[in-house]
Each structure stands twice: as C-alpha cells, then as structure tokens.
C-alpha cells in the first residue's frame, strides 16, 4: 500500500467470521476510497480473523473503520509473535517514543484480552496481563472510561474440535476504532417499514455499497429496485439514490404485503417511507416504473455506481415489457387507461442489457455491483459476463444450496463507451448457462426435487 512520502505503520485488523469471500474486496475497495492501495505484501490469511495491514496513517485507518461492516476493530500493532516469548521480544523492540504518548502519568488505560476459538478463565487473563509489567505504563487503570485501550489478541486456529494449549499467534496493540457492525442490526429488514420477498439482508446491502465505493454526493442507481433495500445502504453513506422497476404495485407500495400476518400493504409502505424511517429521505431522488431492457435515460454518463440484484425467477419473475406469441401474456395495470404487457426476460438478456447499460451510463471509474445466480456443477469463471468497457474487480460466492449459489460481481468502468460497443455481445459461450427463460430456475428446483425424493427414500428405510 503506497502513499507518497508517508512511512507505513502496521495495523492489526480484527474481522468478523462471516461472508469470508467478501472481506478482502471490501477492505481493498475502502482503502482505495480512502486514498490508500492494497498491496500483495500485506500479511493476510484470507480465512483468518486477524490481518496485518500496512497503512500510511491513523486517519486512514479510522476512515476504513467508518465504512467497513466486515471488520470489527483495528489496532496500532505494537507486537506480534508465534509464542509469548516472541510477543514480548517484539514489544521490547517497538520504538519507545511511539509508546510514550499513550503511557503518560496523567493518562488512564485498560487492557482487554480477546481470544479466537478458545475461552480463558479470569485467572488466566490476569496472568497474561501481569506478564506485560515490563511495558512502561505510568498512567492509572480505569476500566470504565479509559483514555487508551490496549488489547492482547490470541489466535487458537480455525478448528473448534482441535484447540491447542498455546495460541498459534499473539498480538498486542492500541485500539484505534471499531467498524460499523452495529448497522447490521439497526438496518435489519425485520424492523423495516416496507419489505418484499427478495429484500436484501442488511449486511450484504452495506457490503455491496462498499464494493461499489459509494461516497457522499454520488448518484447511485438500481435498475431492479424492488422495495429499495439497496438504495438505503448507499443513502446511509451520503449518496443520492434512484431506481426503476417494472412492477407498478411494488414501486407505488400497493397490493399484497410480503410481511407475515399482513394481507395488504399499508398507505405509507413505499421506498420513500423506508428512507424516511432511517432519516435519509433527503437523499431520495425517485423510483420510476420502467423496463430496464429499454432505458429511459438521456445519453451520457449519469451514475457513479449501479448496485442491483436482478431477478433470477425463483421468488421474483424475470419480466420485461412487450409480448411474445409463444409466451402467455400477463397484464399489469399501471394507469386507468394503459395496460403494460410483460413477457419473459431471459437471464442471458438481463445480464447483457445490464452490462451494456453500465458501460454507457456509468462515469469513468464508476462501479457496477450485481448478483449472478450460478448452478455450481456447471460454473467456470469464463461464464461471468464481460464487457470491453468494464473491468472485473471481484467475484465472491454466497451459497444458496448444495448445487446453487449466487456470486457478487463487481466491475469498474475503465473505457469510454463508443457506438461500436453498443452490441458487444460477449462470446455466446459465456451466456449459454442462461439461455432459455428461467434455466437457472429449472435447475434450482430440479435440485430441490431430487433432495426431497432422497429424503423420502431415506425415511422409508
């Protein structure tokens, strides 16, 4: 990680042990947003909750923690070892002049112990704290409201069935800041005013905004807006948000409710009300009834980020306006005098249209973040849709079942859109897994049917 003229300081990042594949792209994206750069020299074990990062300044470390939902805390690393002896030797080699500002006689402090994959007794904790008496602490201990908090962190490995007596790694550092994990609870869809069948989990919603490097005063667009869950996380970070959807009832908050024990939506159940619930209404631009396959926007770059979750045909239908002779027409009332005719929308066409739209309407350096449904037995990296104007940044998997998953794809616009890119259909081979309406849907439910049949057979034995 580089920042011109700045010496790099080592920091310890403590991460939450969920959504493991999503953590590195989130931290990398946020560091670049803060003006840093993630280098291959970082001391990172992808599945470990402890990462050592080289960051130019404490302010950049704080900036990272003001955004991340994957990390719990960050510490200025004073010592690290594979044994207690190595840790103490490392601490003795840490420059005293860097320690002293936090060890003054008129300051207060406390020491906290955190262990991963093992629980220590209070006596064991006290013994470990007493072993640090060689450090020049001269302030007073204050357990309730200290000025400085120091942490001993111990890693006992990833196997809960084989916990070692001694830790594999030990760390000591000064606490700098906590991440934004509390947002997962405060924005939980359980408490949200307006939800749908496919409302995005709050944690994943914030991860998507971070992968998209959403920042204050950006304009963020969701072409499959649904109930607007993805707009909320972007608005929380200060972006102005808008979206479109083909379902008139959802956009206007009409029709049947998705919430249990509620038949119809209330008079104030809509996207705007969701943003109002969180004090974010000022960031709401609009939500329009529109077909994503037929863009309504004027030509030119309009959006800093496009963050979306296209329909897969499982809980929400894949539809677009128009009609097909071979398909059964469905009508949806939009105004008193106009009926929208919708037809099937192939998954291959959804992703082709989405990438083409992003290439044309994203600003240079803007990001597209979307979910790609995958039938795992057939998955290869080659089937991830590409576009000549978009660079693939990250590809993270979330399991849905033993045979299906979805992948969070993040792409960045690196080339200006030209007329010749209008129909840049990438090789047909990339889209073959999605050919035919709801091919993913059929494979998803074929797996469910097979599992049910197997369970019934096992029960008969």
Swiss-Prot record:
Alphabetical list of Gene3D superfamilies matching this protein: Vaccinia Virus protein VP39
Q: Which domain of life is it from?
A: Eukaryota
Enzyme class, top EC level, equals: transferase
Disulfide-linked positions? none
- Could you list this entry's UniProt keywords, alphabetically sorted: Cytoplasm, Methyltransferase, RNA-binding, S-adenosyl-L-methionine, Transferase, tRNA processing, tRNA-binding
InterPro entries named in the record: DNA_methylase_N6_adenine_CS, RlmKL-like_Mtase, SAM-dependent_MTases_sf, tRNA_mtfrase_TRM11
Q: What is its EC number?
A: 2.1.1.214
GO CC, alphabetical: cytoplasm; tRNA (m2G10) methyltransferase complex
The reply on keyword Lipoprotein is no
Task: Provide the GO biological process annotations.
Answer: methylation; tRNA processing
* SUPFAM superfamilies to which the protein is assigned, alphabetical: S-adenosyl-L-methionine-dependent methyltransferases
- Which cell locations does it reside in? Cytoplasm
Q: What is its main location?
A: cytoplasm
User: In UniProt terms, what function does this protein have?
Assistant: Catalytic subunit of the TRMT11-TRM112 methyltransferase complex, that specifically mediates the S-adenosyl-L-methionine-dependent N(2)-methylation of guanosine nucleotide at position 10 (m2G10) in tRNAs. This is one of the major tRNA (guanine-N(2))-methyltransferases.
Q: How does this polypeptide assemble, per the annotation?
A: Part of the heterodimeric TRMT11-TRM112 methyltransferase complex; this complex forms an active tRNA methyltransferase, where TRMT112 acts as an activator of the catalytic subunit TRMT11.
- Family, as annotated: Belongs to the class I-like SAM-binding methyltransferase superfamily. TRM11 methyltransferase family.
Q: What is this protein called?
A: tRNA (guanine(10)-N(2))-methyltransferase TRMT11
What is the organism of origin for this protein?
Answer: Gallus gallus
